[in-house]
Each structure stands twice: as structure tokens, then as C-alpha cells.
Amino acid sequence: MLQRKSSSNVASDSERRSVFNETSFILLVLATIANGLASDFFVWSKDAGNFPLSPLVVFTLFVFVYLHQKNQNHTAALGIPIAVLALFMMIPSSLASWIGLLLASLLYRIQTDRFHQSLILLIMLALTFIWQNSIFKVVSGFILHAETWLIGAFLAPFYPEMTVYTNHLLFHNGHDLSINVGCSVFSNCSFVLLGWVSMYFLLGNRSLPIKWLAILFILLTLTNVVRIGVMAIDYPTYVFVHEGLGADIYNTILILLSVTPLLFSFCKKEKKACD
């Protein structure tokens, strides 16, 4: 009888420790993300930039916490990933925070020997900010030139007198467009893909559908081409699409694309009902 009680107490203590470790991991993840966004919030507070927190990032964090608590591991120790998060969250650097988040996620995978959906979201989130804030800025010259050429190829039938020069679209009426980082689909797509995968996992799916992600990227590319084509009409139209109501419509379209997994879920339910 005493042996059973002792075993039960040991199991209970082990479970409490694991819950504490998992909770600490989640809190440190959120603190590291806050540190990664701190500089952007500082710039925004000085009225020198846009609000730095995308609704899709907020949604991803919600899904991460929900899935992680649902699938948390009650056996493995998490000392190393927790220590990495605690270290990197104290470094006053946005890039360091995202690198720390990526390292901690990979170490979590190694220590627990599990690769569940919440961890995929965490890795995608870290890579999204590392890509946007660092890697894309380094390689943007080549990417923007190639993307401008592609946009020019699509728009050529509608603007026969248009000329493509590096990352510029030159029109005969003097209304020229420069395709910069903010206009690139490679900059805008990362958050949409993140939101799409978050919704996909929230609906109970487990594996990443590479085919659908590729289709989504193609849709984002075509949407961006149409947007730039409309901006090329004249300057007032450019202002409307780039800064006015047109910008809000475009952002709404991006959010709607990110929640398209709901359509898959609805179609599956309809199919089951018919069967």
C-alpha cells in the first residue's frame, strides 16, 4: 500500500514539474516574441511607422498556445530550450530574439522527440521574421529585379508601351512605379502563409499540405500583380490603392485568403453529410 502511494506521489510530482516546464516554455516564448517586436513598437510609438503587430501574428500566437497546451509533453525535461529562451529574451536585439526562438524550438524538438503542430507554427513564426527583417533585405536586389520582370510580363498586354528597368516599371505618361520591399509578394506572403497554416492546424489537420501552400503562393502572386496593374493606371489611382481604401481592401483579401482552410473543412462536412 505504501509502495503504491509512493509511486503515485512520484508520478504526481513528475507531472507537476512537466506542467511547470511547459508553462514556463510558453511564457518565455511569448516574452521572447515581445522582445523581438519591442523595437518596432518603439518606432510606432514615435509615429514613425505602421502598427507592428499583424492580426495574423496574433492569431498564430493564439493557435500556438492552444495547440501546445493540448499536446504538451509530460515526460521530457525542457531545461535547455528554456535556458536558451531566457538568454535570448534579455538581448536587446530583434534579430537575436527570433534566432533564439528558432533555436529553442529546434532544441525542444530534439529533447522531446516530438514535432507537433504548435512547434511547426513557432518555427514558421521565427523564420518569417528572420526572413523579413534580415535575409530578404540582403537578397532583395535580385528578387525585386526578377519579380519586377515577372510583373512586367503579366502587365505587358495591358500596357504595351511599358518598359521594365531593374525594379522599375516605366510608362509613357511619366507615371512610373518602383517595386520595393513593401510591394513584393515575397515580403507580404509570409504572414498570409503563417495565418493559413495556423487555421489549417486549428481545424485539426496534422500534416503540411505543400500542394495547397504552393497554390496559395500563386494566388498571392497574381493578386499582387493585379494590385500593381491597377496602381499603374494613374497617380490618383495609385494613391487610392497604395494608401487609401484600396489598401484596406487588399489587406482584407490577404486575410480572407489566410482563412480559406475553413472552406476545406466546410466541404468535408458537406461531403460526409451527402455520404
Residue ranges and their predicted role:
Residues 2-275:
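Hydrophobic N-terminal alpha-helices or hydrophobic patches in metabolic proteins across all domains
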